[in-house]
């Protein structure tokens, strides 16, 4: 049985065909370097080389024995020239074509036409009839360069007037034959685009949709569309270098397929031993990607200093967590007591501590430890102070510094805020605002209120365990309205109480009394804003009640009593009036017909 001969056998005559590639001739240069490094006999024994466009230049350099390094150096210079202009190679000022032509004059030897005659086949497209013409006979170096220049000329891209070869005008041969001389049975085809060629990119084997264009079968894929764009409008140099290595690796894969084919043949021999050695070296050097189990290995190898630093950074978080979770005020130390405080609602912007308030639901932030130097530096949770009088005074000064003086002055109708100290009461349960049940202010579950009266301050002092003020001290305002045991109501959410009429400081006149009504932000948030922005009326009516000037009957049961000077201290539990939504409030005075029916 005779030995079977395969295409690509270096001992038999064969041909090599280069397709059109444009700027992607980096790919073909990589394939040529792979053949020179690993299978030099394949290039030495090839008796024919064919090429079109930039592939014709590659074929001419291979025939003349010129290294690809020189061609890539000039190609890099042409790329830099194209990147100078906004239109790239379409710019009239671009001199890329002239640079490539000058390169051929410089690099080709004077007798290059002798080597190329009969061995180099250049594909051209004739302008007159649009037929494909293959040129293989050259009489001079200039004629060879003109044939190569005609094969690379793309109208409008390289110019508007086609060049001439032996009196005829020709343009790029890729318009009629992208892969020249593909009908040769012994031809090894090298293509930049993914197709059915011997050496070409292998994008996706599951796509079998091909389309034929320029007498060439293209594989329909997004990668091929990208390559067509890069061939005319070059990308960055890094991407073009990737094309070079891709061509090198694809040529190695082709040579390995030939080795496998000859191993199955009767000869049982490896015709390209350098390819197998090259592949073993690549595996030994570890150019393959590491397994997934070893990718996170550097992250696991950390020095003991890094681990100790991690523990040192984690300790403050633990300390902050412990200080935040502690609920007993009496156990807090001066160092840990002022680290965090509970954030109050927007309507109650009063905080005795000077530290920034942090919400319990927000993530813990590093807070510097500060030692309190006085009662006004103490935290709002720790309400026990060594000096009760100094503690209350510090709280009042801190509240005045926070800006409550201006807010209270606009809401109390030109009354001084120094005689009406705001008192911060314990926080209320959030469920109380939803149910609306009556809860006394003195209880721990009641909402936080700012009672603008001395009685509210006295009640809060009784709640906090402080000694009450002297009864001989005259109160700054009237007492909180007492509704009696038959109609107890209370606020279900944090709110601000409104002052009743009191005597202006420095004058003997008394201001008209106003009903003390407490409003919850859950019912109507706009009413609370109106309370602080607008000046209160001088009469006993509010904006939420309808005016009725003709009616003289005191239809309302809510009345304010004047405050005597010797008013006793309020009890521990104080009831305040809850004002519902304005749409649910009835008029003070009823019409005569309705009042008669009710009677």
Swiss-Prot record:
GO terms for molecular function: acyltransferase activity, transferring groups other than amino-acyl groups; hydrolase activity; omega-hydroxyceramide transacylase activity; structural constituent of skin epidermis. Residues 325-335, 350-362, 490-501 have a biased composition (Polar residues). One of its GO terms (cellular component) is cytoplasm. It comes from Mus musculus (Mouse). It holds the Pfam family Patatin. It comes from the Eukaryota. The keyword Transferase applies. The active site is at residues 53, 172. Its EC number is 2.3.1.296. Gene3D superfamilies: Cytosolic phospholipase A2 catalytic domain. Residues 16-185 form the PNPLA domain. This is Omega-hydroxyceramide transacylase. Disruption phenotype: Homozygous knockout mice lacking Pnpla1 are obtained at the expected Mendelian ratio but die within 24 hours after birth. They display shiny and taut skin, often with a necrotic tail tip. They are less active, markedly smaller, and weighed significantly less than their wild-type counterpart. Unique linoleate-containing lipids including acylceramides, acylglucosylceramides and (O-acyl)-omega-hydroxy fatty acids are almost absent in the epidermis while there is a reciprocal increase in their putative precursors.
